[in-house]
Amino acid sequence: MGNTGGAARDAERYRLGYPGQEAEEDPRAAQNEEFYANQRRCLPDRMLIDDLHAQWFGQSARLERGHGFIQWLFPIREPGMNYQAAPLTLREATAMREQPAVRQRLLKSYELMLDFYGMRLADAETGEVGRREAGHAAGYDNLNHSSHNYLRITRVLKCLGELGLARLQAPWCRFLVREVLDREGGGGLLPNCADSLENYWVPVVKDEAAREGLLRQIDILIRGGGGGGGGGGGGGGGGGGGGGGGGVGASERTLPPVLQAVEKPRDAVRSEGGAAGAEQDDDAKDWSDAADDK
């Protein structure tokens, strides 16, 4: 199942606020803050954020092909593949969290990407996410087969947590659990996303109770929940975190039909090996085609 140990360490480091990293950050850096204040243009697209929101919403082909905008719309405290964008700093994140205009723009960035994936923010207060009312199938098909978007989703979730909208993380992941795994519940339409969902998306949810509940739900849907609530047993360890790896190694799992059909393709397209080495390696390998984010 890939570098799940590295993924777990990456997620924990994110949730803990990147211990020790502040000393290495430039206290004068303000690139992300200025972009979200609509005062700096992103590069290489040379657009202000308000113009990007207005002109790119619903432009699926442009969002799929573009490789430089995602690091600007969703800055995180990790380097990305766009050398013209800068990692978020703790000083920037702290300042931006206090600005209502930043949160409003971040919400628009989030809605832009949800729409691209065939989804919509049904309730901005509760964070409830649903399928886009028209044409969700095209977005789902692209997401199910365009694996660089799995890296984008990891980045979006992390950014929501950094800039004051952590409350939106769990509701989106809850929706994704259904859409990826729960065929009996009317979902199961995004099976290729299963590995990323379990090992990269849910583990960065900052709300501990919500995160562990989601991991238990995933365990039940994938493995029947036979492992109990312990901390990570055999090969299931890293990505399951507090949700209970159940002591069942990847090679021993009996996958439900929705996953059996895609186990080989999922291995082939997996594009997240943890923020340590493998995720960067995948980015470097696929940059010329599509991989635009770590």
Residue ranges of model-derived segments:
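N-terminal leader regions that mediate targeting or early regulatory function
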Residues: M1-T126, G130-E133
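Long, compositionally biased intrinsically disordered regions
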Residues: N3-G5, G247-K294
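Alpha-helical bundle/repeat cores within regulatory domains of eukaryotic proteins
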Residues: E125-G226, G249-V269
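Acidic-enriched, low-complexity/disordered segments with a strong bias for Aspartate over Glutamate
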Residues: D10, D26, D45, D50-D51, ...
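Intrinsically disordered, low-complexity regions enriched in glycine and serine
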Residues: G225-V248, A275-A276
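Intrinsically disordered, low-complexity regulatory segments enriched
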Residues: A61, R77, V177, K206, ...
